[in-house]
Structures are given as C-alpha cells and as structure tokens.
Amino acid sequence: MRIMISGGGTGGHIYPAIAIANQITEKHPQAKIQFVGTAKGLESELIPKAGYEIKHITVSYLRRKISFHNVKSIAKLIKGLVEARRLIKDFNPDVVIGTGGFVCGPVLYMATKLGYKTLIHEQNVFPGLTNRVLGNYVDRIALSFEEAERYFKSKEKLIITGNPIRREFLEISQEEATQKYNSGSKKHLILVVGGSGGAARINETVVNLLKKHPNNDFKILLVTGQRHFETIKLQLGKKQDTLRYNDVLPYLTNMPHALKACDLLICSAGAITIAEVTAVGKPAIIIPKSYTAGNHQEFNAKALEEKGAAIMIKEEVLNADRLYLEITGLLSDKKRLEQMAKASALSAKTQALEMIYAEVISMIKS
C-alpha cells in the first residue's frame, strides 16, 4: 500500500494528516507513506517528528486582494504543480489524501489530472478555499460537520467522519483524570485553552477576571501558549490570592487528562479542539478567534452552540465581567451543566479515523 498525504500551514491541517497516517501504518505496518508539504511550513517540523518522510514543493497562499504578492504566488503555484506532478509519478500512490492548507492544492489537483484516486478531509464547518476548489475534482470528501455539506456541489462524494483525535481522549477514566488534576479539591476546575498557540484575547480576559475576583468557588488552569506565557506571568504578578488556587502553564503535555478532569472548558473554536471537547463530553464557553480565514472558528462555535453544548462569546464583546457572569451562572446551575455535557457527548464523532481508513481501503479495492 502506497499513500501520499498533503496538508499544512497550521496544526489543524497537520495533526489530522499525521493521525490518518498512524491509523494506516498501524493496520498495515508495511505501508509506504509519503507526505508532501512546504519547506517553510509547520509541517516541515511536525511530520519528521512524527516519524515520516516529507517531500517539499514550492507554493504560496493567494491574498484576496490584487497585489504583487499574488503575481509571485501564481508563479510559485505553476512551479508547485510541476513539482507535485513529478513527486506523484515517482511515488505512484494508491490514494492521495489532502487535509487542507494551500500546499495540498497543487498535489491533489495534479493527482486528479493524472488519474489517481483522491480524498480530502475538511476539518471545519466553513471549508477552506483550497478544499472548496478541490471538492470539484477529487473522488471523495470527508467532512467533520454535517453543516459543511452545503459548500460542496457533489453530494455523492460526501461522507461525514468527524475529526481524527488521539485515542487517549476516549480511553481515560474520569477518576484517573481527576486524580491527576483536581484531587482532593472541592472547587470546580475550569480549563482555559486558546488552541495550540494560545489566544491573547482569552489570556488577557482571564487575567483581568482573576485580578477582579481572586477568591472563587472555582479554580482556573490557564494554558497560555508558549509565546504568551512570560507576558501573562508578568501581568499576574506574585499576588498570593490570585495564584493560590489557580495555575498558569505555557502548554499542556497531558491535554486528555486535563480536559477529562475539568468541569467547564473555556476555549477557542479550532476544529480539533471542538472534536476533543465533544469526545470527552464537556460543557464549554467558546470564544472564536476573529482573525481566522473565512471566520471559520465562528462557524464551528455556532454549530456547537446550536446543539446546546456550548455558549459562544465573540471576541469583540468579551470582557472579564461578561466571562465571570457566564462562568458563575453555569456553575450554579448543575442541571444546565449536565444538559450541556450530554449535548456535547451526543455531538461527538469518535470513529473518524476508522471511517477514513475504511474509505481509503474501499477506494484501493474499487
């Protein structure tokens, strides 16, 4: 079995690609996996760390406005198509998989033109531009949200799979997680995460909340993101009241345990975060990042809010007082928390990897 996978730019495109590769190699240890990305993208760092080889092509994103940058990008796109063609013919894959990001555009498009079997995976409610275009050419389209169906014309290509997540999120018990992160405490645990890189707006709001309300019936575990950590530490200072029960970390190496242990999650609305929180069935206050491409995080957040699993607060109206009111309102209403948790769990799609793998096998056999 020979599988080519392309996706990059952000962790939201790269981690699903790695998860799919891991699923295939677990089932077929002799399978050959070839990743294709850019030399400057995050994929060039994460893919080798995951144990896979990556080949590079030349490609750059297109801006929405006419600019000299776009002229250069078109030239790079043409070069990338030529490079992708060569890589595909040399590797001769059984299936070519794309997980989003502009880098997979030339690879998947060229694969369709050369007659190879192709599948794309879309993580968000509002699909990225690359996948919306590729949807017209590829054989199969795996979606994470039913709400994304409207953006693709060829309904017969669609399959609802959900987002691939690590198995640890499904295997950890509540008791084990609580023992690790909230043992012996009678306070509610609130986990705050702003995605893999953190979210400045969420961090600042939580800092202001802790300064205004240092003594609460809840404690906060704030994961700032590495680049925000020192700034947040300085803003909090060394006030004993503020940090007595609360904790601030640059990143979490054990997200599955922390997420399972918390009573309430405050987070941004990245597709993988949404998949993880629903997998463990937790209620959430979701604050979508306003600067994401196509405002896709707001679409993700709305989908979960409409299912009754979350409350959405837009960044433009977010402040410490509003967040505090939402937190205390939820924690004082046990029935509502339970209803949100149930709705969250019902929203989960935990068989994404198995479904994508089955689709790949079906394509190879057809």
Curated annotation (Swiss-Prot):
InterPro entries: GlcNAc_MurG, Glyco_trans_28_C, GlycoTrans_28_N. Pathway: Cell wall biogenesis; peptidoglycan biosynthesis. Its main location: membrane. Pfam families: Glyco_tran_28_C, Glyco_transf_28. It catalyses: di-trans,octa-cis-undecaprenyl diphospho-N-acetyl-alpha-D-muramoyl-L-alanyl-D-glutamyl-meso-2,6-diaminopimeloyl-D-alanyl-D-alanine + UDP-N-acetyl-alpha-D-glucosamine = di-trans,octa-cis-undecaprenyl diphospho-[N-acetyl-alpha-D-glucosaminyl-(1->4)]-N-acetyl-alpha-D-muramoyl-L-alanyl-D-glutamyl-meso-2,6-diaminopimeloyl-D-alanyl-D-alanine + UDP + H(+). Its EC number is 2.4.1.227. Gene3D superfamilies: Glycogen Phosphorylase B (3.40.50.2000). UDP-N-acetyl-alpha-D-glucosamine binds at T10, G11, G12, N124, R166, S196, Q297. GO terms for molecular function: UDP-N-acetyl-D-glucosamine:N-acetylmuramoyl-L-alanyl-D-glutamyl-meso-2,6-diaminopimelyl-D-alanyl-D-alanine-diphosphoundecaprenol 4-beta-N-acetylglucosaminlytransferase activity; undecaprenyldiphospho-muramoylpentapeptide beta-N-acetylglucosaminyltransferase activity. It is a peripheral membrane protein. Keywords: Cell cycle, Cell division, Cell membrane, Cell shape, Cell wall biogenesis/degradation, Glycosyltransferase, Membrane, Peptidoglycan synthesis, Transferase. The keyword Membrane applies. One of its GO terms (cellular component) is plasma membrane. It comes from the Bacteria. One of its GO terms (biological process) is carbohydrate metabolic process. It is found in: Cell membrane. Belongs to the glycosyltransferase 28 family. MurG subfamily. HAMAP family: MurG. Cell wall formation. Catalyzes the transfer of a GlcNAc subunit on undecaprenyl-pyrophosphoryl-MurNAc-pentapeptide (lipid intermediate I) to form undecaprenyl-pyrophosphoryl-MurNAc-(pentapeptide)GlcNAc (lipid intermediate II). This is UDP-N-acetylglucosamine--N-acetylmuramyl-(pentapeptide) pyrophosphoryl-undecaprenol N-acetylglucosamine transferase. It comes from Alkaliphilus metalliredigens (strain QYMF).
